[in-house]
C-alpha cells in the first residue's frame, strides 16, 4: 500500500505504524513519592516485554514521567543488543502537565519525535473516575486519614495490598479532571487509537462519553487496581501493534489477576465510537422511567466507598427500566460498546483503614453514577456531559 504527500509516495509498511506514549504524571505530594516506585516497576515490565519480542518492530514507545511534582522528563525506549535503554528527549519544569495546554505540549512533542500512523496513550496515576478533584477537598475523612497513615510507612511495611486509589484525595494540586485530559488531546490535534488507564475507577460511562471524540477505545477498570498496576509484561504484545487485540489484552489482565496473591481485578475494553448511540438509548429510557430508590441496595456496586459512587451500568438499567423492548435495545447497544470484559469473582478495596472484599454477581464492564447518593457524586454528576446528554 502506498500513500502520498505532495509528489512523493512511500510504502506504508516502511513507516512507523504506532507510537505509544506512556504518561506517568506526579502522584504524590511535596514530601511523598506516591506511585513513583510502582511506575518504575511498570516501565521495567514494559521493557521486559519488548526484550521478549526482540524489539519494537515498526512501532515506537515514549515515556513522560514526573520525578518530582515540578520536574518531569520525556524519554524514548530504544531497543538494541538484546536490551532496552531510555534516551532522554526533553526535561520539563513546573506543573503544566495538569493543564490542557501542558498535555497538548507533551503530545505534540511525542508526535514531533515519533510520527506514526497511529498514536496511543497509557496513563498511570491515581484515579477516581469522572469525579471532579475539587469536590474531594473535604471528603472522605477516612480516606484522607488512610493516605496520611500509609505514607508514613514504606510499601513493604504494609501488610495489605495497596491500590491506585491510595493518596488520590490527599493533594489536588497535581490532579487533572477528565475534561482537561480530553481538551489537551483535542488541542494536540491527535485522535488516539486507544487510551489505557492504569488507574482506579476509570471504566465508567461518564469518562467514556467524555473521551468519545479523542480516542477510539478505552481500556480501564471499573474498580480499584492494585498498586502494581496493569501486568504490562503480559499485555504489551497485544497492544503494541498496528491493530491492537483488545480481547487478548483483557484476557492477559484477567489471567494475571486470577493467579495474583490478591486475586481481584476487573477490566473492560470500550469502543468510545459507540458512546453517542449508548447515550441516545439511555436518554430514551430516562424519558420514561425514574429510578425507584428502594432498589438502590440491590444494584451491583463496584467500588468500596461507604456511600457508593460506581454502580454496574447493566444492572442499574435492568432495575430502572421495565420495558422489554427498551431493555433489549439497551443491552444490544451495550454489547456493541463494551467489546471485551473480564472480572474475578470478587473486587478488593483499600479506601479506609481495613481492606474489604466485595462479591461480583453481575458485570457489564461499565459503571454509572446516576443513582449514587454520595456527596461527591451529587456535587458533580449533573455537570458531566454524559448527564447533560441523557437527561432533559
Predicted regions and their residues:
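C-terminal motif of bacterial Sec signal peptides marking the signal peptidase cleavage site
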Residues: 2-4
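Solvent-exposed loop/turn segments at secondary-structure junctions
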Residues: 26-30, 67-71, 95, 125-131, ...
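Short, solvent-exposed loop/turn and secondary-structure capping segments
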Residues: 32-33, 74-75, 131-136, 207-208, ...
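Structural recognition of the beta-strand scaffold that forms the well-ordered cores
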Residues: 19-23, 60-65, 120-123, 193-197, ...
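N-terminal extension/subdomain marker
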Residues: 6-117
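Terminal, contiguous helix-loop blocks that mediate binding/assembly
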Residues: 13, 148-392
Amino acid at each position: 500500500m502506498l500513500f502520498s504527500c505532495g509528489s512523493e509516495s512511500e510504502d506504508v509498511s516502511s513507516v512507523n505504524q504506532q507510537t505509544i506514549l506512556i504518561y506517568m504524571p506526579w502522584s504524590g505530594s511535596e514530601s511523598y513519592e506516591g506511585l513513583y516506585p510502582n511506575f518504575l516497576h511498570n516501565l521495567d515490565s514494559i521493557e521486559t516485554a519488548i526484550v521478549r519480542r526482540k524489539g519494537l518492530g515498526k512501532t515506537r514507545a515514549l515515556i513522560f514521567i514526573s520525578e518530582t511534582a515540578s520536574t518531569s522528563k520525556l524519554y524514548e525506549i530504544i531497543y538494541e543488543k538484546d536490551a532496552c535503554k531510555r534516551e532522554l528527549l526533553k526535561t520539563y519544569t513546573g506543573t503544566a502537565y495538569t493543564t490542557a495546554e501542558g498535555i497538548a505540549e507533551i503530545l505534540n512533542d511525542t508526535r514531533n519525535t515519533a510520527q506514526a500512523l497511529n498514536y496511543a496513550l497509557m496513563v498511570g496515576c491515581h484515579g477516581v473516575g469522572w469525579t471532579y478533584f475539587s469536590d474531594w477537598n473535604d471528603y472522605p475523612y477516612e480516606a484522607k486519614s488512610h493516605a496520611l497513615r500509609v505514607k508514613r510507612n514504606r510499601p513493604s511495611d504494609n501488610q495489605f495490598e495497596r491500590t491506585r486509589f491510595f493518596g488520590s484525595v490527599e493533594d489536588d494540586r497535581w490532579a487533572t479532571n477528565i475534561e482537561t485530559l480530553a481538551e489537551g488531546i483535542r488541542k494536540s490535534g491527535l485522535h488516539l487509537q486507544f487510551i489505557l488507564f492504569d488507574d482506579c475507577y476509570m471504566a465508567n460511562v461518564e469518562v467514556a462519553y467524555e473521551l468519545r471524540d479523542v480516542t477510539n477505545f478505552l481500556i480501564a477498570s471499573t474498580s480499584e487496581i492494585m498498586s502494581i498496576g496493569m501486568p504490562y509484561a503480559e499485555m504489551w504484545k497485544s497492544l503494541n501493534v498496528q491493530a491492537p487485540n483488545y480481547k487478548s489484552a483483557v484476557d492477559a489482565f484477567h489471567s494475571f489477576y486470577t493467579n495474583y496473591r490478591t486475586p481481584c481485578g476487573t477490566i473492560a475494553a470500550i469502543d468510545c465510537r459507540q458512546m453517542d448511540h449508548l447515550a441516545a438509548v439511555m436518554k430514551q429510557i430516562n424519558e420514561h422511567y425514574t429510578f425507584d430508590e428502594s432498589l438502590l441496595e440491590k444494584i451491583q456496586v463496584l467500588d468500596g466507598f461507604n456511600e457508593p459512587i460506581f454502580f454496574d451500568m447493566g444492572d442499574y438499567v435492568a432495575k430502572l427500566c421495565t420495558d422489554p423492548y427498551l431493555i433489549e435495545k439497551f443491552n444490544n447497544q451495550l454489547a456493541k460498546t463494551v467489546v471485551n470484559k473480564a472480572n474475578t469473582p470478587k473486587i478488593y478495596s483499600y479506601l479506609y483503614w481495613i481492606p474489604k472484599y466485595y462479591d461480583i454477581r453481575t458485570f457489564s464492564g461499565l459503571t454509572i453514577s446516576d443513582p449514587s447518593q454520595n456527596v461527591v457524586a451529587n456535587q458533580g454528576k449533573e455537570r458531566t456531559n454524559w448527564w447533560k446528554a441523557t437527561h432533559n
